[in-house]
């Protein structure tokens, strides 16, 4: 299972957001006993701002711990930044999704 974090950062907040991300990663670093980063901040520029996506694999049985870490980090990062949006979702791996339908590779 994966955790997918998506951010939308208004253009005028880009520098402040980048600084907060660096600070947030220091304050709440990834814990490789519960999560393994896959994509660490892929960014695209769009009309409404910069869209940033991070994807990490959740270690079996550590979903709550990962959500706690990610939400603490996200709340730290957005503090004082107007116009920021973010979402946190889970996604199944291909094999996990196939198992739901009784299939295997």
Show which residues each predicted segment covers.
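Charge-dense, low-complexity polyampholytic segments
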Residues: 70-74
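Conserved short beta-strand edge segments in small beta-sheet-based binding/regulatory domains
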Residues: 76-92
